[in-house]
Structure formats: structure tokens, C-alpha cells
Regions:
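A short, basic N-terminal segment
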Residues: 1-57
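Mid-core helix/loop region of P-loop NTP-binding domains shared across ATPases and GTPases
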Residues: 3-5, 14, 102-112, 117-168, ...
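Hydrophobic residues on short alpha-helical segments
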Residues: 44, 306-314, 332
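Walker A/P-loop nucleotide-binding motif
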Residues: 55-75
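C-terminal helical "lid" subdomain and adjoining coupling/linker elements of P-loop NTPases
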Residues: 60, 235, 244-305, 320-324, ...
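Short, hydrophobic-biased segments on the C-terminal half of alpha helices
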Residues: 77, 166, 353-357
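AAA+/P-loop NTPase substrate/partner-engagement loops
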Residues: 82-113
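Terminal-proximal interaction/regulatory segments of ATP-powered molecular machines
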Residues: 323-399
Length: 399
């Protein structure tokens, strides 16, 4: 190997100054949160009683992906903890990604582990190995021992396998599970219709307040990216780069998460090309990469047959154009072909219909019902909302 150590590594990043400002997990300060003053104020009002040691309202937050729901919930919760401390109230918040912790046991374990300090409580919260009821009992003990108020953020709440944890958390005080701690829940969902699936008892206790976060417009997206532009070194961004990224993201339902991803990927593409500037032309390439990563994350954990159904729709879309979608029978025919190619037994038509409904719920596809008259009867068309090339590429690389 001919490279010296000095040749092998770059000691100074020529593009990024503070790259973490462009990471989705980064929680920015108030000055970097753009276009959500009203939503932050509404959330703060809902949980305001907590700073005095009283029960915060339970809140359900709706909005499309990338509209700032998680960001604002975390920001308000962090500020609540700080302000409550100034008032002599011991508070904290726990965050659960329900797309990862989909079961009741996983979610309650994450909450208990997040709020625990074993040196103080002498309560152990193992990753696994306890019953759900034991995790709950330990959680209630921790809350009463350590805190006056706790807020639990359940992100992507619609990914939970059932409503049981919502019932337990929203009624913990009423049921006498905790006596010295007040507990509030902030549920976050991309699906406005999610509430329709809830148990009526959960709905009555969890949905005390409801807020809808609208999509960002192009100007707001531009401001969001400009507020994080110091992630880059001075002078590396071409003047047209941020406006172009904002325009592309605005076209995709005002998704700020995607806008930030596009900007970060454009910088990485500049790095890999050896460019000293982040050019507008890199933004288009970055959008494709962001779209691919977003879809990959969307189908993470899905079953092989769930993927075969999507693959069938991608095949139809690429062969025939999107049209107005494709009938269930046609999708099923291509799905069966894919199953044969994969050496897998196909599921029943009824089960494939269920999988298509699940994809529609996740906004991966759109379903529309049609009447074919007395000769054909009614039928359902299914249309991909994702780029079929992206769907094909992601499903092919994972097969």
C-alpha cells in the first residue's frame, strides 16, 4: 500500500463545518425551528400545567411526514423539563419510536429504561426477559420514586400493534398505578384517520387535545435550510442550491425532513466528486438518494410477501405507466409470477387485498373504487404513490 497516513485521511472537511445540524436526530435550538411558532405555542399550552407539578393534557398530533411533529414535541418537552426545574418540579420526558418498538412490551421497556437511574432506584430494566406486567410495575415504581411529572412521546403511534400501552399510560393515575407522579402522553401519527382505529376508551382519555401540523411551503422549506446553512463551510453553497432543494421538497408534500436530507446528500455528493462547492446539479442526484432512503425506511421490517405485492405494482407501473392504477386481479396475477420466481408459495387473494390495504394506510399506494356497471360490478384500482424505479431498485437490492 503506497499511501502514507497523511494521504489516506482528510484532516479537514472541505464541505461541512458542523454536519450534525443536518442530521434528522439533531434537535435544534428555538432559533432554528422555522414556521412552527403557533404549533409550539399550542403544545406548550397543553402541557403547561406540568411545570407546576400538575397533570399535562394528553395530546394527539397529526401531520404528514416531515412537518415538524417530532421536532416540536421534543423541543417543547425539553423546555418543559427546564422550566419545571426552575419551579422546583422534577420532570423528564421519554421518547419512543413506535416504528421500532412496535409491541407493548418493547415500548414500555424503552420508557422504563429511559427514565430509570439504577443507582438511585436500584431497579433493573433488562432489554428482555421480563413479562409485560413486570415492566409496567417497575416503570410505575421508577416514576413515583424519581419524578413529579413525566411526558411520554409516542412517535409513529400508528405503528403500535395494539392500543394496550395507550390505555395503560393514559389511565395510570386514574387507575392508581402511580400516586406521586403525573403522566402525560404526546402521540404522533402521520395518519389523520388513525383515531378511527382506536378503542373508544383509549380515544376518550388520550385525545384530550388534537393538533394538525400542515405541510411546509417552499418559502418555509427554504428558511428551514437557510437556518441550518452554517452546517456548511463559508462559500461552499451555490446561491441556487437551497432554492432548488426547497422547490423539490415542496413538490413532495412540504417534507422538511426530505429537504434537509437532500441538502446533506448534495454536500456528500460534492465531497465524493472532489468539488469545492455544493452545486445545484448535485441537488437532483441528492433527491433521488433521499427518495430511495426514505422508501427503504418506510418498508423496513415488512414481510417478503408485502414486498412482492409492491414489486408487482412497480412492474405494472414501469410496463404500462401509472394510468389510474391497476385492478386487484391484475396485481395478484403479477404477484403470483413473482412468488414463482422467488420459489415461494403465494398467499390467497384475500390476504393480498389485506396487504394492499396496509400499503394504502402507509400512503405507499392509493386505492380507488370504481363501478364497472352491471356487467363487471365494482372493482378497486391500486396506484403506486412512490417512484416505481425507486421501488424496484430498493426491493431488488434487498431480495
Amino acid at each position: 500500500m503506497s499511501e502514507t497516513a497523511d494521504d489516506l485521511f482528510t484532516r479537514e472537511d472541505p464541505i461541512f463545518a458542523t454536519k450534525e445540524l443536518l442530521e434528522i436526530s439533531h434537535l435544534p435550538g428555538e432559533g432554528r425551528i422555522v414556521g412552527r411558532d403557533d404549533e409550539i405555542s399550542q403544545l406548550a399550552t397543553a402541557v403547561n400545567p406540568a411545570i407546576f407539578g400538575q397533570s399535562p393534557s394528553n395530546v394527539l398530533i397529526y401531520g404528514k411526514t416531515g412537518t415538524g411533529k417530532s421536532l416540536c414535541a421534543k423541543y417543547v418537552s425539553r423546555r418543559l423539563v427546564e422550566t419545571a426545574g426552575d419551579e422546583g418540579v422534577t420532570a423528564t420526558f421519554a421518547y419512543v419510536d413506535c416504528a421500532q418498538d412496535t409491541t407493548e412490551t418493547q415500548a414500555v421497556q424503552t420508557i422504563a429504561d429511559s427514565v430509570n437511574a439504577v443507582d438511585d432506584t436500584e431497579i433493573n430494566i433488562p432489554d428482555k426477559g421480563l413479562s409485560t406486567s413486570t415492566y409496567y410495575k417497575r416503570l410505575w415504581r421508577i416514576l413515583d420514586q424519581r419524578f413529579d411529572v413525566v411526558v411520554v412521546i409516542l412517535d409513529e403511534i400508528d405503528k403500535l400493534s395494539d392500543d394496550d400501552i395507550l390505555m395503560q399510560l393514559s389511565r395510570a393515575g386514574e387507575a392508581g398505578k402511580i400516586t406521586d407522579c403525573k403522566l402525560g402522553v404526546l402521540g404522533i401519527s402521520n395518519k389523520i384517520q388513525y383515531k378511527d382505529r382506536m378503542d373508544e376508551r383509549v380515544k376518550s382519555s388520550l385525545c384530550e387535545r388534537e393538533f394538525v401540523f400542515p405541510p411546509y411551503d417552499a418559502n418555509q422549506l427554504r428558511n428551514i435550510m437557510e437556518a441550518r446553512s452554517d452546517a456548511f463551510r463559508d462559500g461552499v453553497l451555490e446561491p441556487s442550491t437551497i432554492p432548488r432543494a426547497a422547490a423539490l421538497a415542496a413538490r413532495e408534500h412540504g417534507d422538511a425532513r426530505k429537504a434537509i436530507d437532500i441538502l446533506r446528500y448534495a454536500g456528500e455528493i460534492a465531497q465524493s466528486n472532489g468539488s469545492t462547492t455544493v452545486k445545484e446539479q448535485f441537488v437532483t442526484q441528492a433527491r433521488q438518494r433521499a427518495e430511495t432512503d426514505r422508501f427503504r425506511e418506510l418498508i423496513r421490517g415488512s414481510t417478503p410477501h408485502s414486498r412482492y405485492v409492491l414489486q408487482a405494482l412497480a412492474v405494472l407501473s414501469l410496463s404500462n405507466g401509472q394510468q389510474e392504477g391497476f385492478r386487484t386481479s391484475r396485481v395478484y396475477e403479477i404477484y403470483e409470477n413473482i412468488c414463482r420466481q422467488e420459489g415461494s408459495d403465494s398467499l390467497s387473494l384475500r390476504r393480498v387485498r389485506d396487504l394492499l390495504k396496509e400499503h394504502a394506510f402507509l400512503d405507499i399506494i392509493e386505492q380507488s373504487k370504481h363501478s364497472g356497471g352491471s356487467a363487471e360490478g365494482s372493482y378497486t384500482n391500486h396506484q403506486l404513490l412512490e417512484d416505481p424505479e425507486v421501488v424496484k431498485d430498493v426491493l431488488t437490492e434487498d431480495s
